[in-house]
Amino acid sequence: MKRLLSLLTGVLVMTGLLMALIFPQSAYANVSDDKLGDRGEKVDLNNSSVRAFRQFPGMFPTIAGKIVVGGPYASVSDASSVLDASQKSVFDKYKDNFTVTDQEIAVNEGFDRINDGQYR
């Protein structure tokens, strides 16, 4: 009986290893990876975290926080509606670096867009 269980366990392990080789890793990709790949080099106003705005001087954290909390947006120019006059001028300076795609729940769940847990 012990040999039979050992044999069955070995067969199951080998089957699992073979299945991992047969199915490509792209089959395991999740929605978040697809969404983040869609936007290219631009920052997606509907799906990016506040941290993504650090590359634009003057936007992190105040303007970025307002944009993240104020979404979703239909177009890039809609994001300026949550900003005051001085913040709009900073936003307009970097406007070409932003894009808008449909919101994805996997990226926007909870407070992950405010604090995505990336620390130095």
Curated annotation (Swiss-Prot):
Gene name as annotated: psbU
Source superkingdom: Bacteria
Transmembrane feature ranges: none
Locations listed in the record: Cellular thylakoid membrane
Alphabetic keyword roster: Electron transport, Membrane, Photosynthesis, Photosystem II, Signal, Thylakoid, Transport
Protein name: Photosystem II extrinsic protein U
Subunit structure: PSII is composed of 1 copy each of membrane proteins PsbA, PsbB, PsbC, PsbD, PsbE, PsbF, PsbH, PsbI, PsbJ, PsbK, PsbL, PsbM, PsbT, PsbX, PsbY, Psb30/Ycf12, peripheral proteins PsbO, CyanoQ (PsbQ), PsbU, PsbV and a large number of cofactors. It forms dimeric complexes.
InterPro entries: PSII_PsbU
A single GO cellular-component term on record: photosystem II oxygen evolving complex
Pfam family, one: PsbU
Function summary: One of the extrinsic, lumenal subunits of photosystem II (PSII). PSII is a light-driven water plastoquinone oxidoreductase, using light energy to abstract electrons from H(2)O, generating a proton gradient subsequently used for ATP formation. The extrinsic proteins stabilize the structure of photosystem II oxygen-evolving complex (OEC), the ion environment of oxygen evolution and protect the OEC against heat-induced inactivation.
Coiled coil: none
